[in-house]
Amino acid sequence: RLAEQVQPDVVITEVGGTVGDIESLPFLEAIRQLRKDLGRENVCYIHVSLVPFISGSEELKTKPTQHSVKELRSIGIQPDFIVCRSDRPIDAGIRRKIALFCDVDPKAVVSAEDAPSIYEVPLTLHEQGLDAMVIERLELECGELEIEEWRTFVEHRRTLSRSVNIALVGKYVALPDAYLSVNEALDHAGIFHDHKVSVHWLDAESLSPEEVESRLKALHGILVPGGFGVRG
C-alpha cells in the first residue's frame, strides 16, 4: 500500500526478532512472497546476525550466523548480504567462512562492529561498499553519493569540547531505552549548540524532597519526561 501511495524508489522493511521464533514466521513468509510477487530483481534481503566473541577460546564464532541463515533458507529466503554484528572487527578468514557456509559472495559479508556512536555506522558500511552493492543488486540508477556532510556531522559530534550536564528525572530510568527519543533529542540539541550533553539518570521514586537540592544543584538543567500515574 505504501509503495502504491507514495511511489518511493526504495522501501526498507525491518523484520525484527530471531529467525525460528514463532512470532516472526508470518512476517518472514510475507517477505518471502514479496520477492515472488515483485520479482527477484526488485527485492533484496539483508540479514543482520550476531558474531559473538568467546573469551575462553578467544575466537569469533560463526555458528549462530550459519544456523540463522540455514533457518532462513529452510523457509525459502536466501540472504543477498550478511551484516555481522560484533564487538570487534571481522577478519577476512571469518568472512570467507561465513560466505562459504551461507552461500553468499565474500564481498557480501559486511562487518558492523560496535561503534562509539550509531551515526558512525553508515560510514563503516559505506567504506565496505554495502550501499554500492545494494544499488547494483537492485539495478538502480543513482548519482554520485554525497556523504561529506554526514562525515562532517560525525566528526563534529566526536570533537565537541564543551559539555553540559542535564538531569533526566523519570520513573523508568532503570531501562534507559524507555527514554531513547528524549536522550537523542538532547544529543541533537547539544550538537547544534556545540556542546556534549551528559545525561544524569535519576529515579523519581527514590528522589526525596530533602535531597533534591543536593542532587540537582550542580547540574545545568533538569528534564522530567512525561509518565503515567502520580509518580510521573
Which residues does each PLM region occupy?
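N-terminal beta1-alpha1 cap of cysteine-dependent amidohydrolase-like domains
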Residues: R1-D9, G17-G232
